């Protein structure tokens, strides 16, 4: 199997080591000897609860998450996070976005449901070919937050600096 592996350097999923894939394949049929796949077990089962507890412990250890913080396992992916940002950060109802690619544009569109969103920059007319310099940004001083997508894998652009936003 390892001789004909394809190297995948695209955005998103990437190559995994063969031993990892083999363990996943075995667990897909019989997760750690439980007699069932993770896809088949109840989210209320002891085995599944063990998966969640082990995952949380690993996250806390690797990321140094203190005990006074909760670890949440939520569904939804990026689109849900695009809504969660304004739902949690908007205070006065104003936020600024730099539209530099697909994700930033989707985040901006979702955020518009929650308040007064302002495009502080857009490179859409040039097919998202660059991120702004500090001087190109039109950040409002009364915005609750300023949103950027730091790495635009579809268009191959990224920020090499953290924009100054004021207080």
List the predicted regions and their residue ranges:
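Conserved PLP-anchoring active-site segment centered on the Schiff-base-forming lysine
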Residues: 90-105
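Short, well-ordered alpha-helical microsegments
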Residues: 17, 81-83, 104-105, 155-156
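Short His-Asn-centered micro-motif
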Residues: 74-76, 97-101, 148-151
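A general structural motif
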Residues: 4, 68, 92-94, 142-143, ...
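A glycine-/small-polar-enriched, mobile loop at the entrance of the PLP active site in fold-type I
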Residues: 5-56
């Amino acid at each position: 199997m390892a001789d004909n592996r394809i190297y995948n350097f695209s955005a998103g999923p990437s190559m995994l080591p063969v031993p990892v894939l083999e363990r996943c394949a075995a667990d897909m049929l019989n997760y750690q000897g439980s007699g069932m796949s993770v896809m088949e077990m109840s989210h209320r089962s002891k085995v599944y609860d063990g998966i969640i507890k082990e995952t949380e412990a690993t996250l806390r250890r690797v990321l140094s998450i203190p005990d006074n913080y909760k670890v949440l396992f939520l569904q939804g992916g990026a689109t849900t996070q695009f809504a969660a940002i304004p739902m949690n950060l908007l205070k006065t109802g104003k936020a600024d976005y730099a539209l530099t690619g697909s994700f930033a544009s989707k985040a901006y569109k979702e955020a518009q449901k929650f308040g007064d969103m302002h495009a502080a920059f857009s490179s859409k007319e040039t097919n998202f070919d660059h991120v702004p310099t500090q001087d190109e940004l039109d950040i409002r001083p009364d915005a609750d937050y300023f949103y950027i997508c730091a790495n635009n894998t579809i268009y191959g652009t990224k920020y090499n600096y953290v924009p100054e936003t004021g207080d």
